[in-house]
Amino acid sequence: MKSSTIPPMYAAIDLGSNSFHMLVVRHINGSVQTMAKIKRKVRLAAGLNENNTLSHEAMQRGWDCLSLFAERLQDIPVENIRIVGTATLRVASNVDIFLEKANQILGHNINVIEGEEEARMIYQGVAHTSGGNGRRLVVDIGGASTELIIGEGFEAQALTSLKMGCVTWLEGYFKDRALTQKNFDSAIAGAKETLAPILQQYTDLGWQTCVGASGTVQALQEIMLAQGMDEVITLAKLKRLQKQAMQYEHLEELDIDGLTLERALVFPSGLSILIAIFELLNIDSMTLAGGALREGLCYGMIDELQHDEVCQRTIKSTQQRYQLDVEYAQQVTDLSIQLVQQCGNDWLTEPQALPLLTAATQLHEIGMCIDYKKGGEHSAYLINALDLPGFTRAQKHLLGELLRRYREYFSAMPTQHAVSDISAQRMLRILRLAIILTHRRDVNLAPAVTLSEKNDVLSLSIDGTWLAANPLTRSELEIEADKQTNIGWDLVIDARD
């Protein structure tokens, strides 16, 4: 194979205050595919003394980690590598000593970026990997700094980097490692005091959605899922986790379901900061972003991906990767949208429901790349297993359950947390009808139909002459009407004269 045909590789290294991270990706089929993620706990911020001098021990931990990263960088073009240092390296008085040896180890220069630039790159990473419309608030709690950004699309409108993080708050408010009400209250109050100067600006701008882009938020979500909660983070859930933590006297004893040993040390401090952010900014809910600083660095090196809509880019790339019939998928999509509109603009109650239905129609045949038999099962497996930038875990679960039922297998939708139960039910009904009505895979051969709805009783009106000339479609529609009606979803097929 000629080297020019090999997809280009890119690497981003983030020298954080708690951990060092390396992300390696390749650009293929118009999207970014993760090839490697390497993380080492360095706790650089813990090596700062009261004069902001970085200890030799902390620097050595960093150099040891970079020696591992250096091996992987040898395979990547120099112009495709970005290495940045963040909060701890910004304030360390002896940073030059660390950087001189670190640059030698890596064979590349490390760029210590300012807090506002870090916030900007975090926002780009979120914008390129997380779906959603409207203005978003992004929160990234690091080891020694917390970034808050408000933006829309790919444009950040407010950028702030604050000097508080899960490592510095650990040393400042949980130094005795006691999980007491007093320590939590002090940590939360300290975070609110740090946040106070930006409160007016951020509340004036406002936002429609809030996403968290840090290890702290990821750890909290993993705990919630392990304990049977959904993935949406709320203040009530954060308070519940605080109560669980306070059942233990000291950090060393902390043993909460879903909390890994690696994250346990900085869990109370990160939790305190997030509680303060929720309370002061009056945040209703937060979901986990698909990426942050490292993703922002990688996407910033790929010019053609700068302004594509994330979910559409993901769908297009997945269709190419699995050689799906794009024209047919669009036929199913167009008919699904038409049927939903005929039922009324508010029939699917959540704004994200129709875009998710569209994603299902675009990808429903993905399982056939494995085998036609049990195609729905294969589709569900792939959707849940694939990295799909722009789609949350809950949305992937919903898509998987829709596609599991798009053909032979049929049952009521299970519990999911992406949309309401009634919307999920309606999405499945529309999906199955649209696939039956387009099974000849030619828009010129599809019938003209009208779908009406009253109290969730669906009536599909279709030309009787056409039905008589297409007995297979008629039979499939009659079978579908029986299936839906048998589980309480009344469906009537009306053959017009």
From Swiss-Prot:
Q: Which UniProt keywords apply?
A: Hydrolase
Reactions listed under catalytic activity: guanosine 3'-diphosphate 5'-triphosphate + H2O = guanosine 3',5'-bis(diphosphate) + phosphate + H(+)
Query: Is the keyword Chaperone in the record?
Result: no
Q: EC annotation?
A: 3.6.1.40
Q: Which domain of life is it from?
A: Bacteria
Q: Which GO terms describe its biological process?
A: guanosine pentaphosphate catabolic process; guanosine tetraphosphate biosynthetic process; nucleobase-containing small molecule interconversion
The UniProt record lists the keyword Hydrolase: yes
> Cross-referenced InterPro entries, in alphabetical order?
ATPase_NBD, GppA/Ppx_hydrolase, Guo-5TP_3DP_PyrP, Ppx_GppA_C, Ppx_GppA_N, PyroPPase_GppA_Ppx
Extract the GO molecular function terms from the UniProt entry. guanosine-5'-triphosphate,3'-diphosphate diphosphatase activity
- UniProt pathway: Purine metabolism; ppGpp biosynthesis; ppGpp from GTP: step 2/2
Q: What class of enzyme is it?
A: hydrolase
What family is it from?
Belongs to the GppA/Ppx family. GppA subfamily.
The record describes the protein's role as: Catalyzes the conversion of pppGpp to ppGpp. Guanosine pentaphosphate (pppGpp) is a cytoplasmic signaling molecule which together with ppGpp controls the 'stringent response', an adaptive process that allows bacteria to respond to amino acid starvation, resulting in the coordinated regulation of numerous cellular activities.
Q: What is the protein name for this chain?
A: Guanosine-5'-triphosphate,3'-diphosphate pyrophosphatase
